[in-house]
């Protein structure tokens, strides 16, 4: 199959979060099984990309690269507002290249590339699928702009799709409530790529001077309001007070911010709560540094307002670390009472769950053991096979076979 994957952000721009990693994993997996895969995305910085991608070269529409059998085309960015980019090269790409693909997979909402490609697909009767990646519900920041997007570009994008991909039952219900037909929705979980070898135990603790006997709580993700890092601080503060300042306990807040001052706001909150020396803001962690943090933590917490899946929780589980997630995370049913605890999205419930995992050694040991079984069900093999089957079905429908 000749497949086009369209995404606002792609490797090596990892600061844009989990979608960047997910699209790369899917593209590489599909290419490894013999499909011709092209990724169309935005150029968010050629200088950085050429340092991290072997063979990245200037191209007609921006720059191009080939990695693990995947052709990546980074459209030149002519304007930008937050994560939204203007990439006029998509107008030339579509008439010249789109007819050469059997199917297009569009990731995410609230960008301008996906709707333009979808419109071109409809004109030439090419099937496309849309994977909202948890963006369907406008929850935080610029909500009125997101609603305007749905009323204009987003509505046509989704209604014209052959299928809409949800990564959890939670996201499927959100799509149904938003008017997407049940017959159009396909549920496909995410997978994770686990390194062949983890960093040595205690390497993260040693690097950041976290004592071996200290309770190490990990929050890892973008520092944005949707993921509730401010609530994480409040939960940790309350747990510390309840434990009378548990000796040496540390909260690591790892992840990029969006340059909007939110990290500074969080640092100020930590100081107001008297957590100086107890909270470490490490910035983003990638590669071995990320896996070392997961491995050394006593518990990983994902206190999000809404997560279509929760890749970071899955990665923590793969490292054998118990997780505490809210019931608004798509991964919750997979981990509940097996690899972690699931609680409502409020401070008291999260603090109680944190106390359970940190204070009950038998529970923590049971959850660590349970992580093994959950981790075995989180590879990309099944999701990739499901996508290939779906793609072939839609291509056959178009050809009338």
Name the predicted role of every residue range:
Residues 43, 170, 191:
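Carbohydrate-associated surface elements
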Residues 46, 192, 220, 248-267, ...:
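Glycosyltransferase donor-sugar binding loop
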Residues 305:
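Aromatic "clamp/platform" in nucleotide-sugar-dependent glycosyltransferases that forms part
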